[in-house]
């Protein structure tokens, strides 16, 4: 298996001249504003091959408090991936947080997140 790692502007994915079988987003989607999230999701659609899959982890609205990134409701994920995507799963999960970071205050067991798998339909 070959993996490609890129450092670039995630809002400029449509400018990338290559496509991939799979894309992993571990904690990026939840940092964007509504408008930027739409741009990001549109860009993701351009870099995934037909039949490709996006594996995504983002903070859940089920995580209490306000520390950390924006919380994303499940409905927002369903809406974001309603067009040009096939939602395979949106499941609750948790991030593992380093134990030595004492100033963080998240739920027992780690912050609640959504583990999402969406696919690009085959042509």
List where the protein language model places each region.
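Conserved acidic residues
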Residues: 21
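Short catalytic micro-motifs in class I SAM-dependent methyltransferases
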Residues: 27-31
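A conserved beta-strand element that flanks and buttresses the S-adenosyl-L-methionine
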Residues: 24
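Class I (Rossmann-like) S-adenosyl-L-methionine-dependent methyltransferase catalytic domain
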Residues: 1-18, 32-123
């Amino acid at each position: 298996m070959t993996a490609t790692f890129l450092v670039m502007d995630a809002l400029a994915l449509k400018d990338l001249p290559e496509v991939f079988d799979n894309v992993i987003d571990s904690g990026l989607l939840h940092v964007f504003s509504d408008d930027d999230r739409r741009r990001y999701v549109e860009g993701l659609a351009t870099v995934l091959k037909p039949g490709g899959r996006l594996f995504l982890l983002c903070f859940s609205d089920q995580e209490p408090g306000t520390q950390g990134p924006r919380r994303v409701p499940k409905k927002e994920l369903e809406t974001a991936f309603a067009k040009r995507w096939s939602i395979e799963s949106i499941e609750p999960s948790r991030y593992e947080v380093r134990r030595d970071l004492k100033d963080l205050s998240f739920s027992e067991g780690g912050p609640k997140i959504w583990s999402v798998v969406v696919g690009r339909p085959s042509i």
